[in-house]
Structure formats: C-alpha cells, structure tokens
A protein has these predicted regions:
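Catalytic active-site module of serine/aspartate enzymes centered on a nucleophile-bearing elbow/loop
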Residues: 242-274
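Conserved HGGG/HGGXW glycine-rich cap/lid loop of the alpha/beta-hydrolase fold
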Residues: 12-62
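Short beta-strand/loop motif that positions the catalytic acidic residue
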Residues: 212, 218-220
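Acidic catalytic loop of the alpha/beta-hydrolase fold
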Residues: 223-227
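Alpha/beta-hydrolase fold catalytic core
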Residues: 1-24, 45-48, 85-86, 157, ...
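Conserved alpha/beta-hydrolase catalytic His-Asp/Glu region
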Residues: 125-132, 145-210
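Conserved acidic catalytic loop of the alpha/beta-hydrolase fold
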Residues: 71-88
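Flexible "cap/lid" loop of the alpha/beta hydrolase fold
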Residues: 105, 111-144
Length: 274
C-alpha cells in the first residue's frame, strides 16, 4: 500500500502493524521506493512490517527547500510519526545508509536496529578540491545536456560485479533487477540528483559510530568499488557488537544484482535480534 501524506515523505508498506520488528528501507542516490518493493513484500510475507520511502525529492515525495542529511533525518522521523512506527530497524543502502546513521545521531530513540549496506560513515575524502572534482565529474553528463536515463546507462555498469552485465549490454539485455535499478535512476529528477550529490560530499558521521548501542549489521558487496568491503569492515569494528558480512559475487547494487542473498543476510540479522 502506498501512502502520500501532507507534510511527510511518501512510502509503501505491507505486513502486520503488531509485528515483532518493523523494517524501513532507505534507498540510495539513484533509487526510490519502487526499488525496494520486492523487499517490502518479502519481509511482509514473513510477518514483519516493512516500509520503503521515497526520499524527499524522489518519486512521490516533495522536495525539501534544502536537501541536507539533517533535514533528511528529520523527514524520516516525521514519516515514522505519521506511519505510527515507534521504533524501526533501518535498512539503508548506499546514501540510505548515511541517512540511517544521521538518524541515529538525531533520533536514536526511534531506532531498534541498523543495517548499513554498501555505505560509509563519511564521504571518501573531506578535502574540498576532491569533493568539487567528484561533484563535477558526476554532474558533467547533466551539464552537457544528457538525461538521467543516459546517466544510468553509463553509471550502472560501473556499479555491479564483473559479469553481472554483458559487455556493452543494451537495456533489453539487463537482468530484471538491474533493469529496475536503471528505471529507478532514470526517474530521479535532475535537480534532486544535483542536490543529493552536493549533500553526499559533506556527509560526516564517523564520530557517531562508537555511540551506536543497537544491533547493527554492516553489509558489504565483494566487488563494490563505491563502498569497498574494507570500509564496511572497519565501520563494524568501531560499533560495539556490530556484525559484518560480505556478500560474495556482488557489487554496489547488491540487492538489485541478486536479491536472495541480500534478503537472507537481513533476515538472519533480524531473526537473531528481534
């Protein structure tokens, strides 16, 4: 079921409201709630309550006047209020993992657990020149008049494991999961993509890691070049009691590449702790 309330982000959900755990899926910079529809359905079928949001500015959610991680976490808390979720297990992929860490800093009382997947506690380098170069490189196609579909054409093959796509694959040759990832990225409004990139390079929550006191899983993809396994492993070491798992044969788009191992890892974690 899709919800689009006034004053809060839109989300989809399924599953019983009295479930032993409520999972909230948070997508990345090129995603949307539709990318987690199968995850919502899967966990609801196992009697968990599951939600997936459209981050502000994405899909059915209105854009924020200023897209910052602080404001994104506030929007997430507002969605939890409207959805009547007291405590949630946040499952954040890529930029969504950063939103989850920011939410821990701002409203830890609303968080029962964390799954940080293919993400990082800070942008790669805090050097201003590096940030500007990163943003310029990512925005160059849009600045040259390319569409988000053309951005997806170029980016997605660089974010998956070797052999996940045939060399030079056309969209018609994409496996179903990666075709979904392509559709999600293609649908991101260019203005939102620009604003998200500017926020991304300013993200910094490394100091929050030792304060995390809820069950946490740091989930890596073996072939992820965007958030390499070593980044996730080191993050887990800085969180008391955190678990680390690396999904063999997968890249940055782990759940889109093969959803079964992603679901299995999250399910094992949830069953252990909730």
């Amino acid at each position: 079921m899709m919800h689009r309330p006034e004053g809060a982000p839109a989300w989809i959900e399924a599953g019983p409201k009295d479930a032993t755990a409520t999972l909230v899926f948070l997508h990345g910079i090129g995603g949307g709630k539709k990318g987690f529809q199968s995850s919502v359905d899967y966990f609801a079928s196992l009697e968990y309550r599951a939600l997936a949001w459209d981050m502000p500015g994405y899909g059915d959610s209105l854009a924020l006047e200023s897209l910052t991680f602080k404001n994104l976490a506030q929007s997430l808390e507002k969605m939890l209020d409207v959805a009547q979720v007291n405590k949630a297990v946040l499952v954040g992929h890529s930029m969504g993992g950063m939103v989850a860490l920011q939410a821990w800093s701002q409203c830890p009382e609303r968080i029962a657990g964390l799954v940080i997947a293919a993400s990082s506690p800070a942008f790669g380098q805090q050097d201003g020149d590096f940030q500007q170069q990163f943003v310029a490189q990512r925005l160059a196609p849009l600045n040259a008049g390319k569409t988000m579909t053309q951005v997806a054409d170029k980016l997605i093959p660089t974010m998956v494991a070797p052999n996940a796509l045939p060399v030079g694959a056309t969209l018609a040759q994409y496996p179903e999961g990666l075709a979904l990832a392509h559709a999600c990225m293609s649908a991101v409004p260019p203005a939102t993509y620009r604003a998200s990139l500017q926020a991304l390079v300013k993200f910094e929550q490394r100091s929050a890691l030792p304060t995390i006191s809820v069950p946490t899983l740091c989930l890596a993809g073996e072939h992820d070049k965007t958030a390499p396994p070593e980044v996730l492993r080191r993050m887990a070491q800085k969180i008391s009691g955190a678990e680390y798992e690396c999904l063999a044969g997968l890249g940055h788009l782990m759940g889109f590449e093969k959803e079964a191992p992603f679901h299995e890892a999250v399910l094992k974690f949830v069953r252990r702790h909730f």
